[in-house]
UniProtKB/Swiss-Prot annotation:
Highest rank taxon of the organism: Eukaryota
Known partners and oligomeric status: Core subunit of respiratory chain NADH dehydrogenase (Complex I) which is composed of 45 different subunits.
Gene label: Mt-nd4l
Molecular functions per Gene Ontology: NADH dehydrogenase (ubiquinone) activity
Organism lineage string: Eukaryota, Metazoa, Chordata, Craniata, Vertebrata
Keyword Transmembrane in record: yes
Official protein name in the record: NADH-ubiquinone oxidoreductase chain 4L
Main location: mitochondrion
Residues passing through the membrane, by range: 2-22, 26-46, 59-79
Membrane topology, as annotated: Multi-pass membrane protein
Length: 98
């Protein structure tokens, strides 16, 4: 295992732990999710460059699409909660009744 792959794995793990630890605010949870998606994107991009498979070339682009969708939905929820309640607490998600 190379040191770059180890660093990316640690970045993913720290973002995952941050998601579990900082659950009270939606903004910090969204930032941790973006860190996870960024580390996944870089890991798949580097592994795609090392392999010569044409099928695996689309995986990093697919991860970017999912990251963009996750960011859009997360920011829409953040705006809705902030406008309605004035705070970005995750406990307010239950009150939206979506």
């Amino acid at each position: 295992m190379t040191s770059a792959f180890l660093n990316l794995t640690m970045a993913f793990t720290l973002s995952l732990l941050g998601t579990f630890m900082f659950r009270s605010h939606l903004m910090s949870t969204l930032l941790c999710l973006e860190g996870m998606m960024l580390s996944l994107f870089v890991m798949t991009s580097t592994s795609t460059l090392n392999s010569n498979s044409m099928i695996s070339m689309t995986i990093p682009i697919t991860i970017l699409v999912f990251a963009a969708c996750e960011a859009a939905v997360g920011l829409a929820l953040l705006v809705k909660i902030s406008n309605t309640y004035g705070t970005d607490y995750v406990q307010n998600l239950n009150l939206l009744q979506c």
